[in-house]
Amino acid sequence: MDEKLALLRTVPLFVGLDDDELKVVGALTTEVDKPTGSELAREETFGSEFYMIIDGSVRIHRAGATLRTLGPGDFLGEIALIDHGRRTASATAETDCRLLVLGHREFHSLLDAQPDIRVHVLEALARRVRQLTPEHEV
C-alpha cells in the first residue's frame, strides 16, 4: 500500500489529500500488468477507466501519429471518470507496464461517500480542463 500511496500523492487529481483519504482512493484501485503492445484505450471508443502508470511507458496517439509518451507517475483517462465519453486518442503500452486502474463506478462511489474528496477532485479536474483547453476559456 505504501507504493500505491506514493503514486497517488503525485497524481494531480489527488494531490493534497491526506493519507487517510489516499487510502480510501487506493482501496478502490486495482493494480494490473499490461504487456508491450497492449491497447489501453482506443480513439473514438467509450472509456470508463483512469490509468496511473507505476512502471513502463505508454504511447498516446491519434490517427497513427504519436502525441506524447507517458511514463511512471503519469496518468491518462481522467475525463472518462466523469462522462463515460469517447476517447480522444488511443493509448498503447510501449513496454511492459504496471498500472493502477480506477473505474468509473468506483470513482463515483468515492465521490458519493467522501464529500471532501469530491470537492478536491472536482477542483483538480477543472484545473486539468483549463490546462488542456486554454484557447477556449472565456
Give the location of each predicted region:
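A small-molecule sensor/coupling module
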Residues: K4, D20-V24, R86-T88, H104-V138
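Regulatory nucleotide-sensing modules
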Residues: L5, R9-A63
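ATP/adenylate-binding site constellation spanning eukaryotic-like Ser/Thr protein kinases
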Residues: D19, D55, P72-F75, D96, ...
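Helix-loop-beta junctions that constitute the ligand-sensing/allosteric loops
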Residues: T30, H84-S90, D96-L99
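Short beta-strand His + acidic residue motifs that chelate non-heme Fe in jelly-roll/DSBH
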Residues: I60-H61, E78-I79, A89-A93, S109
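Short beta-strand-to-loop transition segments that serve as allosteric relay/switch motifs
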Residues: R62-A65, D96, H104-F107
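Short acidic-glycine-tyrosine-enriched beta hairpin
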Residues: A65-G77
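Short, conserved catalytic or interaction motifs in soluble domains
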Residues: P72, L81-H84
